[in-house]
């Protein structure tokens, strides 16, 4: 069974404290905007690794593709959307 965007959002929220999260997708390919203080001081690859860690095995088994925009709260407030 393919996950819904709401389920992917919940999976990420369970493993990563998010200030804001939006997820869209078709059940196989998803796009996410994730705003988290956990991203402070981290580069893009490290931020994506945090999200992949939050998804765990689901990333391999349920989510086939995830395009992410990962921002700190300051970046989001500054308009880096």
Name each region found by the language model.
Residues 1-28:
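N-terminal first-folded block
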Residues 24, 33-35, 69-71:
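Solvent-exposed beta-strand sheet faces enriched in polar/charged residues
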Residues 29-31, 76:
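Short, active-site-adjacent cap segments at secondary-structure transitions
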Residues 33-46:
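A short interface-forming secondary-structure element
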Residues 52-81:
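C-terminal structural segments of small proteins and small subunits
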Residues 29, 48, 64:
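Histidine-centered active-site/metal-ligand motif
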């Amino acid at each position: 069974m393919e996950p819904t965007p709401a389920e992917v959002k919940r999976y990420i929220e369970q493993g990563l404290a998010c200030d804001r999260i939006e997820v869209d997708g078709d059940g196989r390919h998803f796009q996410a905007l994730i705003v988290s203080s956990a991203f402070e001081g981290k580069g893009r690859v490290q931020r994506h690794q945090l999200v992949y860690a939050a998804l765990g095995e689901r990333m391999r088994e349920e989510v086939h593709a995830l395009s992410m925009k990962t921002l700190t709260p300051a970046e989001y407030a500054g308009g880096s959307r």
